[in-house]
Design a protein with these regions (language model features):
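Feature responds to low-complexity, polar/acidic, surface-exposed segments characteristic
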Residues: 2-39, 46, 50-109, 116-120
Length: 120
């Protein structure tokens, strides 16, 4: 729980620090993003923490976020690895911790990282 609070505090501080930036969302469905979240989505997508769904052209704000997507966001914020270059190193942790995750799944490294860090 303490780690989760640190992660959320870091994310909030990051968003608040960069809140002066004004850039447009790169997502095709940005009109569906609630105005009160638009700035945060813009900043986090510019930082490559949010990468969109499927081919990355949509944000899908009305779609339920999955455990895999949350794990990817947490991984990118905590590690700073927005290029996901080391995420695969944690894939084996996911397979041993969760019966519904295979080491070959696109999200296995993120789930593995969060599991190993005691976040999920």
């Amino acid at each position: 729980m303490r780690n989760l609070k640190k992660i959320l505090a870091l994310a909030l501080a990051l968003v608040m620090t960069l809140s002066l930036m004004t850039v447009a969302n790169a997502f095709n469905d940005d009109k569906d993003i609630d105005a009160k979240y638009d700035e945060a989505v813009t900043v986090l997508s510019e930082l490559k923490v949010f990468k969109g769904v499927n081919d990355g052209s949509n944000f899908a704000p009305k779609q339920t976020i999955t455990r895999a997507e949350v794990a990817a966001i947490i991984y990118r914020i905590v590690t700073g690895d927005v290029n996901d270059s080391k995420a695969g190193l944690y894939a084996s942790y996911a397979e041993t911790s969760f019966s519904d995750v295979k080491s070959t799944d696109w999200y296995a490294g993120y789930i593995g990282y969060c599991s190993n860090a005691g976040l999920i």
